[in-house]
Amino acid sequence: MNIIKLKNTAIKLEEQLVIYSKIDPEAIALYSDLKPLLEKAKDGSILKSIEVGEVPGRYRFTERNLQQYGELEEAYAIFSIEVTGGETLALKLFRESMLGKS
């Protein structure tokens, strides 16, 4: 796990949460769910990856309509990838193959 990359993704996600918390109460709830994990990521105290299911809040995108905010969803996805161990080889190859098709 890349601690610096994790910290940067936590900061970017927090920035998006602050923006969308001003317009959607569901974003406030997501921020509340994620705040302890974001704080640990920003201060460098997460030393090993967590399980995918342990990242709070995914259901808020699929069931609570936060997917309408693309920048927030992308920041959440990137943070989730980093906190769960970073981009896997399979994901990297998939992304590269998709870039080659565009």
Model-derived features with residue positions:
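Generic structural concept
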Residues: 7-10, 14, 31-38, 55-59, ...
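Secondary-structure edge/capping motif, primarily at the C-terminal ends of alpha-helices
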Residues: 16-21, 41-48
